[in-house]
Design a protein with these regions (language model features):
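DNA-recognition helix of C2H2 zinc fingers
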Residues: 134
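Alpha-helical bundle regulatory/interaction domains
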Residues: 1-75, 82-90, 96, 103-131, ...
Length: 159
């Protein structure tokens, strides 16, 4: 009879197996590995990378190397996983930052008693300057952060 393991032991075991599979994919000839295995590992790694980005997107210095170190994979593999999923590390990071900024702008309207300054929203979402944030926000949503705050939801891109 197999003794039952607590959830933390199972989680660590799962993480170790995934780490070993990722390492195997990086060091072996991919032609030797069944496609279903590489796809499954890529999907799990993408989920882990997405979770990492969701937690750390506010860091203005966040780079693929940080995610790679955290997941114990190479930066090259990080780029490859995002490419397989039709995006890039930078594009996904920008999307997360802009979505959070949009949420904050909508929840802190001009009509509220103390709206959060747009610059503060930009910096809290990982942007290094308010002007860069405003340019990227307008490219993505088709309106400026100020227009959004004034109630321009009818113009906004829906995610």
């Amino acid at each position: 009879m197999v003794p039952s393991l607590d959830a933390s032991v199972l989680k660590r075991t799962e993480d170790n197996i995934l780490d070993l599979m990722c390492l195997m994919l990086e060091t072996r000839d991919v032609r030797d590995i069944p496609e279903s295995t590489t796809a499954a590992v890529s999907d799990v790694t993408f989920q882990r990378l997405s979770a990492f980005l969701s937690y750390h997107f506010g860091d203005p210095d966040l780079a693929p190397e940080h995610a790679a170190n955290s997941l114990r994979v190479s930066p090259r593999y990080v780029h490859k996983v995002f490419q397989i999923h039709g995006t890039t590390f930078g594009r996904e990071l920008l999307r997360l930052r802009l979505r959070e900024a949009d949420r904050l702008l909508r929840s802190s309207s001009v009509r509220s008693s103390s709206p959060v300054p747009i610059a503060e929203i930009a910096y809290s979402c990982g942007f290094c300057s308010q002007s860069h944030f405003a340019v990227r926000y307008k490219e993505y949503y088709g309106m400026t952060p100020s227009e959004r705050r004034l109630g321009g939801s009818h113009l906004a891109k829906v995610d």
